[in-house]
């Protein structure tokens, strides 16, 4: 516990520590005593103090490490600028090929093009809409299929060449009557699909055919024989 300030003021009269009316060794011994008051609130730390250095180290360790900037060579910058003049948006395949040719990573090429586009838009504020959007990734990487005419050993004649391959036949060949051609055309018709007939209308046999008569007679004879056998 801290001593009472009123009691201390009685003992210590001035910074020298001498007592009023005190003399001898007792007064000198009591005057040598000095009281130090330690404040509970810490004061401002000096830049060279050890506590300030520790706090700076802790803040530096907690801060996010800064990524090092990529140092491009002159040849790489020239190649990137030429590619940017050709197109401001790279596809995935073009970006990968450019990174391999320049010994860079795909991320470095992507970030360089993003920064270059931002710089170009600042230099040309009215030409933002002129930049063509990047095509989708599926359409960019997939190569276009070859045309049918480019395949070896295959030819696809156009519609205009069909007349040369299949010449139009004359409607009526010369020297032949018109009736024969009509009969030949009618005889070459494709037969229609026969519809199944119901049991109510059985097919009628032509009585004029001799073979059909014999079959009908045999069927009737067989049916009468069966009836006779059943009756017996």
Swiss-Prot record:
<feature type="DNA-binding region" description="Homeobox">
    <location>
        <begin position="65"/>
        <end position="124"/>
    </location>
</feature>
<feature type="region of interest" description="Disordered">
    <location>
        <begin position="1"/>
        <end position="64"/>
    </location>
</feature>
<feature type="region of interest" description="Disordered">
    <location>
        <begin position="185"/>
        <end position="208"/>
    </location>
</feature>
<dbReference type="InterPro" id="IPR001356">
    <property type="entry name" value="HD"/>
</dbReference>
<dbReference type="InterPro" id="IPR020479">
    <property type="entry name" value="HD_metazoa"/>
</dbReference>
<keyword id="KW-0371">Homeobox</keyword>
<feature type="compositionally biased region" description="Low complexity">
    <location>
        <begin position="126"/>
        <end position="142"/>
    </location>
</feature>
<dbReference type="GO" id="GO:0030154">
    <property type="term" value="P:cell differentiation"/>
</dbReference>
<keyword id="KW-0238">DNA-binding</keyword>
<dbReference type="GO" id="GO:0005634">
    <property type="term" value="C:nucleus"/>
</dbReference>
<dbReference type="GO" id="GO:0000978">
    <property type="term" value="F:RNA polymerase II cis-regulatory region sequence-specific DNA binding"/>
</dbReference>
<dbReference type="Pfam" id="PF00046">
    <property type="entry name" value="Homeodomain"/>
</dbReference>
<dbReference type="InterPro" id="IPR009057">
    <property type="entry name" value="Homeodomain-like_sf"/>
</dbReference>
<comment type="similarity">
    <text>Belongs to the NK-1 homeobox family.</text>
</comment>
<feature type="region of interest" description="Disordered">
    <location>
        <begin position="122"/>
        <end position="150"/>
    </location>
</feature>
<protein>
    <recommendedName>
        <fullName>Homeobox protein SAX-1</fullName>
    </recommendedName>
</protein>
<dbReference type="InterPro" id="IPR017970">
    <property type="entry name" value="Homeobox_CS"/>
</dbReference>
<dbReference type="GO" id="GO:0000981">
    <property type="term" value="F:DNA-binding transcription factor activity, RNA polymerase II-specific"/>
</dbReference>
<dbReference type="InterPro" id="IPR050394">
    <property type="entry name" value="Homeobox_NK-like"/>
</dbReference>
<keyword id="KW-0217">Developmental protein</keyword>
<keyword id="KW-0539">Nucleus</keyword>
<dbReference type="GO" id="GO:0006357">
    <property type="term" value="P:regulation of transcription by RNA polymerase II"/>
</dbReference>
């Amino acid at each position: 516990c801290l001593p009472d300030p009123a009691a201390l003021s009685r003992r210590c009269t001035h910074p020298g520590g001498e007592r009023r009316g005190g003399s001898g060794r007792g007064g000198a011994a009591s005057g040598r005593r000095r009281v130090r008051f330690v404040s509970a609130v810490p004061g401002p730390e000096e830049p060279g103090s050890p506590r300030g250095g520790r706090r700076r180290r802790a803040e530096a360790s907690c801060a996010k490490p800064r990524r090092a900037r990529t140092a491009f060579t002159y040849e790489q910058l020239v190649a990137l600028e030429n590619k940017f003049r050709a197109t401001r948006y790279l596809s995935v395949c073009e970006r990968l090929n450019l990174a391999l040719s320049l010994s860079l990573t795909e991320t470095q090429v992507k970030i360089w093009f993003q920064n270059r586009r931002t710089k170009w838009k600042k230099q040309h504020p009215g030409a933002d809409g002129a930049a063509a959007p990047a095509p989708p990734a599926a359409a960019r990487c997939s190569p276009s299929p070859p045309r049918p005419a480019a395949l070896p050993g295959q030819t696809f004649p156009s519609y205009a060449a069909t007349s040369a391959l299949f010449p139009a036949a004359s409607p009526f060949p010369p020297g032949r009557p018109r009736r024969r051609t009509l009969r030949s055309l009618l005889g070459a018709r494709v037969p229609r699909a026969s519809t199944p007939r119901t049991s109510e209308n059985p097919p009628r046999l032509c009585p004029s055919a001799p073979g059909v008569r014999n079959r009908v007679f045999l069927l009737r004879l067989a049916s009468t024989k069966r009836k006779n056998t059943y009756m017996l």
